[in-house]
Amino acid sequence: MACHSALAAVPSSRLHFYAPRPPLSTSVCPFQTALLGQPLRIYSSGASIAAAASPRSMVVVAATKKAVAVLKGTSQVDGVVTLVQEDDGPTTVNVRITGLTPGLHGFHLHEYGDTTNGCISTGSHFNPNKLTHGAPMDVVRHAGDLGNIVANVDGLAEATIVDDQIPLSGSNSVVGRAFVVHELEDDLGKGGHELSLTTGNAGGRLACGVVGLTPV
């Protein structure tokens, strides 16, 4: 009997799929299934079907997360910050801010995404480990210490920062917190000023923006 005829002759209520090898006493005929792409055998004695599907390799795809912050302030300073993180790797931050005075400006991630009182209500630097202020490459630093960005003669600052302390998920996620660009250069905790180990003595807050997730 043809294989498709054999299958049709078996009541659907008696069809069973199983993995073990068939008994030697059963008669078999090959049947190709498009579902598995593997040969099936149909067993007339037990009206059962055994599939010998080979193991399939599993491909793990990295989970990409993206976020954005739009910076606004009372001055003419504004900008956009985008963040991308692949799986649990470091976060890549792309910064573009206009309206700055030429030179260095402190750039930090602050604890709160609260801008009800302008940039003042964003709180202190994001500091889950309760450390003192430092440079981005220092072991002792705030997680939100991202150093300085440099504005050109036209007041434009563009930078790419890669950092492993500002993830987009988990207990220390930066989503809902705020980026702030400052008036002055950040002394990276080494200026000897009374504010060096807290703010880097970076001066006033020119513009800020809350981090929010975006479609990938």
From Swiss-Prot:
Q: What is its EC number?
A: 1.15.1.1
Q: InterPro entries given for it?
A: SOD-like_Cu/Zn_dom_sf, SOD_Cu/Zn_/chaperone, SOD_Cu/Zn_BS, SOD_Cu_Zn_dom
- The main location is plastid
Recorded catalytic reaction(s): these are: 2 superoxide + 2 H(+) = H2O2 + O2
Cystine connections: 119-208
Q: GO CC terms on record?
A: chloroplast
Top-rank taxon of the source lineage equals Eukaryota
The alphabetized UniProt keywords are: Antioxidant, Chloroplast, Copper, Disulfide bond, Metal-binding, Oxidoreductase, Plastid, Transit peptide, Zinc
Presequence positions on this chain: 1-62
What does the entry comment about cofactor binding? Binds 1 copper ion per subunit.
Task: Output the CDD domains linked to this UniProt entry.
Answer: Cu-Zn_Superoxide_Dismutase
A GO molecular function for this record? Answer: superoxide dismutase activity
Residues annotated as binding Cu cation are 108, 110, 125, 182
Question: Where found?
Answer: Plastid, Chloroplast
What job does the chain carry out?
Destroys radicals which are normally produced within the cells and which are toxic to biological systems.
Assembly behavior: Homotetramer.
Name the family the entry cites: Belongs to the Cu-Zn superoxide dismutase family.
> Which protein is depicted?
Superoxide dismutase [Cu-Zn], chloroplastic
- From which source organism is this entry? Zantedeschia aethiopica (White calla lily)
Q: Which gene encodes it?
A: SODCP
